[in-house]
Amino acid sequence: MAKKITGYIKLQVPAGKANPSPPIGPALGQHGVNIMEFCKAFNAKTQADEGTITPVVITVYADRSFTFITKTPPAPVLIKKALGLQSGSAVPNKTKVGKLTKDQVREIATKKMPDLNAASLEAAMKTIEGTARSMGVEIV
């Protein structure tokens, strides 16, 4: 028989840098999850991408055990990483902060494809292009 699920926790944590301080500690603590056990498992699984913001969905069961699924980093994080930016533009329609080539967009879309609800790579590329435009990044 399957375990009874008591809740889901969605967090965005820097890869390889999970620690019991907020926001992780309080979020897991209120569900009765062993915080250090999660931190060790998460850090071991994500040590290759150290420092990159990684969304994680934690499923908590009635016996206080848990499983977690890591997702691909958010599109803005990948775009900023590709361009070497700290942040997007405060006024995206007026101030442009960088230029992204179609090849870079294709690379980001390919990486994000498992987590996007796009039917094709072209649709995923359009999604990434829209995100880039809203950050003040030009597509060339």
Curated annotation (Swiss-Prot):
The keyword Nucleotidyltransferase does not apply. GO terms for molecular function: large ribosomal subunit rRNA binding; structural constituent of ribosome. Belongs to the universal ribosomal protein uL11 family. One or more lysine residues are methylated. GO terms for cellular component: cytosolic large ribosomal subunit. Forms part of the ribosomal stalk which helps the ribosome interact with GTP-bound translation factors. Part of the ribosomal stalk of the 50S ribosomal subunit. Interacts with L10 and the large rRNA to form the base of the stalk. L10 forms an elongated spine to which L12 dimers bind in a sequential fashion forming a multimeric L10(L12)X complex. This is Large ribosomal subunit protein uL11. It comes from Citrifermentans bemidjiense (strain ATCC BAA-1014 / DSM 16622 / JCM 12645 / Bem). It comes from the Bacteria. GO terms for biological process: translation. Keywords: Methylation, Ribonucleoprotein, Ribosomal protein, RNA-binding, rRNA-binding. The keyword Ribonucleoprotein applies.
